[in-house]
């Protein structure tokens, strides 16, 4: 269930602006079979197919880890899935704290694909407050700002993404690889090591 949630939601969240969209985009969850300086071989979680990807020279290595609401601070660049409830306000259902290198990725607020009353917001935290027992996170993005309600629910997942190096990507590691397919083959420019 957790993997399905992450798979469904992070596609829009982490897609790089320069990355090709549609059928040419690579977004694969799997386990590393082997890796060297120029390629990474991944066994896909979806069906178990094994595929070799070229590693782009400017590849970004990311480590994903569990975090807490208290880890979020002013000026952090974050992403929030949220649902608009009966009170008309956006209540976060999942939060992610990005590294500085990821600042600006997917920035803005938009409806989630085929999800009724759900939105994805990638924005900079400008402050927090407490209203009716819930934290309210204020965020700003180009062309707008928003209040996100952080209900006191321990089941709301929070993740932190930090920069790492190729040394974190070893055989047996759970990863998410992103990139693009073209006439020259499949190349990844982002490798995220999953918990």
Where are these regions (language model features)?
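Short, flexible, surface-exposed loop segments at domain boundaries
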Residues: 2-5, 10-12, 17-195
């Amino acid at each position: 269930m957790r993997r399905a949630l992450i798979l469904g939601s992070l596609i829009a969240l982490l897609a790089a602006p320069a990355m090709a969209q549609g059928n040419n985009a690579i977004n694969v969850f799997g386990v590393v079979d082997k890796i060297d300086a120029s390629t990474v071989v991944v066994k896909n979680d979806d069906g178990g197919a094994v595929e070799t990807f070229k590693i782009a020279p400017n590849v970004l290595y990311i480590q994903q880890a569990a975090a807490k609401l208290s880890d979020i601070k002013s000026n952090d660049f974050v992403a929030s899935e949220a649902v608009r409830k009966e009170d008309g306000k956006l209540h976060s259902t999942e939060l992610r704290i990005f590294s500085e290198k990821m600042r600006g990725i997917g920035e803005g607020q938009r409806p989630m694909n085929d999800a009724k009353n759900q939105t994805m917001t990638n924005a900079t935290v400008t402050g927090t407050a407490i209203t009716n027992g819930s934290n309210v996170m204020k965020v700003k993005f180009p062309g707008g700002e928003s209040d996100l309600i952080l209900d006191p629910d321990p089941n709301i997942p929070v993740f932190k993404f930090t920069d790492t190096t190729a040394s974190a990507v070893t055989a047996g590691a759970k990863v998410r690889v992103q990139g693009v397919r073209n006439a020259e083959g499949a190349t990844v420019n982002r490798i995220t090591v999953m918990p």
